[in-house]
C-alpha cells in the first residue's frame, strides 16, 4: 500500500535527519545531505502534509469512537489556555497578503512549537501509539524540509526549553480522563487546522 511504502521511505529519510528524539539543535541547522532533499519538491511536500493529515484524521476518529470526543469540545477551547500555535494574518500565509518567506518561517516555527504538544500526546494518548509517533517524526521532517526553502534559515527559532517546560506543566495539570481526552482532541484539531493552512499556502504561486 502507498501509505506503508511512504511511511518506510519517510523513516529512511528521517533516520539520518533526526538521529535522536530530542529537540532540534545543531543537527537541525547544518545538514543538507542529498537523502534529505528527497521530499523537497512541492508535490512531495504536499504528499507529506497529506500523510500527516491522514494520521491525524484516523486518530481523531479513534477518539470519537472510543471516548465520544467528536465535535462537542469546542467550548472547552476557551476554558483551556493551551497556547496552541495558530496562523494569523501577519504570518503571510493567507491568499490576501501572501508572503512566501514570512509564511515558510511561520510554518516551520509553528511545527517546532507543536513538538511539545506531540510529546504530551506520546505520553497520554492511549490509542495507536505508532500513529502519534509517525505524526511527530513526520512533522519534524516537514519542518526540516521547509527550513531548507527559507532564504535565511538561521532566523528560524526553536522553542525556548523553559517555555516548553512551562507548557508541559500546564498540559499535565487537571489531567483527569475527561480533561486529558479533551486536550488531546484539541491538540489534534489545532494541528490539523495548522497543516491545512500550510497545505493551502504552499500551493499559492
Curated annotation (Swiss-Prot):
Lineage, highest ranks first: Eukaryota, Metazoa, Chordata, Craniata, Vertebrata
Keywords from the named record: Acute phase, Cytokine, Disulfide bond, Glycoprotein, Growth factor, Phosphoprotein, Secreted, Signal
Role summary: Cytokine with a wide variety of biological functions in immunity, tissue regeneration, and metabolism. Binds to IL6R, then the complex associates to the signaling subunit IL6ST/gp130 to trigger the intracellular IL6-signaling pathway. The interaction with the membrane-bound IL6R and IL6ST stimulates 'classic signaling', whereas the binding of IL6 and soluble IL6R to IL6ST stimulates 'trans-signaling'. Alternatively, 'cluster signaling' occurs when membrane-bound IL6:IL6R complexes on transmitter cells activate IL6ST receptors on neighboring receiver cells.
Annotated glycosylation sites: 164
Cross-referenced InterPro entries: 4_helix_cytokine-like_core, IL-6-like, IL-6/GCSF/MGF, IL6/GCSF/MGF_CS
Pfam families: IL6
Oligomeric and partner information: Component of a hexamer of two molecules each of IL6, IL6R and IL6ST; first binds to IL6R to associate with the signaling subunit IL6ST. Interacts with IL6R (via the N-terminal ectodomain); this interaction may be affected by IL6R-binding with SORL1, hence decreasing IL6 cis signaling. Interacts with SORL1 (via the N-terminal ectodomain); this interaction leads to IL6 internalization and lysosomal degradation. May form a trimeric complex with the soluble SORL1 ectodomain and soluble IL6R receptor; this interaction might stabilize circulating IL6, hence promoting IL6 trans signaling.
Signal peptide (from-to): 1-21
Family as reported in the entry's similarity comment: Belongs to the IL-6 superfamily.
Single GO biological process annotation from the record: liver regeneration
SUPFAM superfamilies: 4-helical cytokines
Keyword Zinc: no
GO molecular function: cytokine activity; growth factor activity; interleukin-6 receptor binding
SMART domains: IL6
Full protein name: Interleukin-6
Principal subcellular localisation of the protein: secreted
Gene that this polypeptide is encoded by: IL6
Assigned GO CC terms: extracellular space; interleukin-6 receptor complex
Residue pairs linked by disulfide bridges in the UniProt entry: 64-70, 93-103
Amino acid at each position: 500500500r502507498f501509505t506503508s511504502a511512504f511511511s518506510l521511505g519517510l523513516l529512511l529519510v528521517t533516520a539520518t535527519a533526526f538521529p535522536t528524539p530530542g529537540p532540534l539543535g545543531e543537527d537541525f541547522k547544518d545538514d543538507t545531505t542529498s537523502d534529505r532533499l528527497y521530499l523537497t519538491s512541492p508535490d512531495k511536500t504536499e504528499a507529506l502534509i497529506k500523510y500527516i493529515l491522514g494520521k491525524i484524521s484516523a486518530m481523531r476518529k479513534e477518539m470519537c469512537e472510543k471516548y465520544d470526543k467528536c465535535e462537542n469540545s469546542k467550548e472547552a477551547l476557551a476554558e483551556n489556555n493551551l497556547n496552541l500555535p495558530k496562523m494569523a494574518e501577519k504570518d503571510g500565509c493567507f491568499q490576501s497578503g501572501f508572503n512566501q518567506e514570512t509564511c515558510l518561517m511561520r510554518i516551520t516555527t509553528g511545527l517546532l512549537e507543536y513538538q511539545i504538544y506531540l510529546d504530551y500526546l506520546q505520553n497520554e494518548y492511549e490509542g495507536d501509539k505508532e500513529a502519534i509517533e509517525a505524526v511527530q517524526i513526520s512533522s519534524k521532517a516537514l519542518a526540516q524540509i521547509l527550513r531548507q526553502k527559507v532564504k535565511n534559515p538561521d532566523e528560524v527559532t526553536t522553542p525556548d526549553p523553559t517555555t516548553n517546560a512551562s507548557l508541559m506543566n500546564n498540559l499535565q495539570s487537571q489531567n483527569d480522563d475527561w480533561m486529558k481526552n479533551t486536550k488531546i482532541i484539541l491538540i489534534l484539531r489545532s494541528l490539523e487546522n495548522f497543516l491545512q493552512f500550510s497545505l493551502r499556502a504552499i500551493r499559492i504561486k
